[in-house]
Design a protein with these regions (language model features):
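Domain-core and long-helix interface of multi-subunit machines
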Residues: 15, 51, 101-208
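Residue-level detector of anion-binding/catalytic polar loops
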Residues: 38-39, 180, 211, 241
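Generic structural signal for residues in well-ordered beta-strands
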Residues: 69-71, 181, 243
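H/E-rich (His + Asp/Glu) clusters that bind or coordinate divalent metals
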Residues: 188-238
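Mid-to-C-terminal alpha-helical segments outside catalytic/metal-binding sites
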Residues: 226-256
């Protein structure tokens, strides 16, 4: 098997900027083919669940046999909502679920319009709170992939303590759960200018035997596959030789 390049975090609907229709999704797929991807995973935000057009997706799988297409969902994890989430997703068959933390309480900490909220926190306590939420998400057992593991750094507010110390119990929980961590290239285009997770966390993931997949977090067709080859090189340099892919919630590991 030749080089495997996957992009498992693609938002076909974006932030409701696109329609989940065959013509719109085809633009993403054709960009992926142009980027030499072997597999694309569409994973829109769960708030758009009712807007997903499953028939269009099945049609596109037939139309583009040269690339594997997978259908996932990125879910905003909220503590205490696990039962409701399970009931909500029960009627659907996804290939994988990404669990992500975008809110601390009601604060959307990664939204540029709400950066003033950082002033209310001690930066170490903020990181500790964030990673505690990631740990709860992991231990819920509802997800396959940890989305942008260290998203809390998005605006460049770095903790005083070692991030390995702050995230240590989270990484242990991920290891115990058998979940996969994505290397999400969107961080290179945020104020922090660093991939998620950073190199130190990725090295610890490798040491713990945590599998990885590759993701652009594209919200527009032109961003599909963006820096996926660069992320692959980073994973290879750390020591990874396999990449995780999913079908019907079952993980396989392919040569990286």
């Amino acid at each position: 098997m030749g080089q495997v390049l996957v992009d498992y975090h693609v938002h076909g609907i974006g932030h409701r900027t696109n329609k989940h229709t065959a013509p719109e999704l085809a633009k993403y797929i054709e960009q992926g083919i142009a980027q030499n991807l072997t597999e694309i995973g569409f994973a829109d935000h769960d708030e758009y669940l009712l807007e997903l057009d499953f028939s269009s997706f099945l049609y596109l799988q037939r139309r583009y046999p040269q690339i594997r297409l997978r259908l996932g969902l990125e879910v905003d994890y909220r503590p205490g909502q696990e039962k409701i989430l399970g009931q909500r997703l029960a009627p659907y068959q996804f290939d994988y679920l990404i669990g992500s933390i975008h809110f601390i309480g009601d604060w959307p900490f990664d939204h540029p319009a709400y950066t003033a909220g950082y002033a209310a926190w001690d930066i170490d306590e903020l990181h500790q709170t964030y990673f505690s939420l990631v740990t709860q998400m992991v231990r819920s057992g509802q997800f396959d992939i940890v989305g942008h593991l260290d998203l809390i750094k998005v605006f460049g507010y770095r903790p005083r303590r070692s991030v390995l110390d702050l995230a240590g119990s989270t990484l242990s929980a991920i290891q115990e759960s058998g979940m996969t961590v994505e290397i999400n290239t969107a961080g290179w285009y945020k104020p922090v200018a660093e991939v998620y997770p950073g190199r130190d966390l990725l090295e610890e993931c490798f040491r713990l035997g945590i599998p990885i997949t590759l993701s652009s977090d594209a919200h527009a067709a032109q961003d599909v596959g963006r820096d996926i080859a660069r992320a692959r090189e980073m994973a290879w340099a750390v020591g990874y030789r396999q990449v995780a892919v999913f079908e019907k919630r079952q993980r396989s590991l392919l040569p990286l």
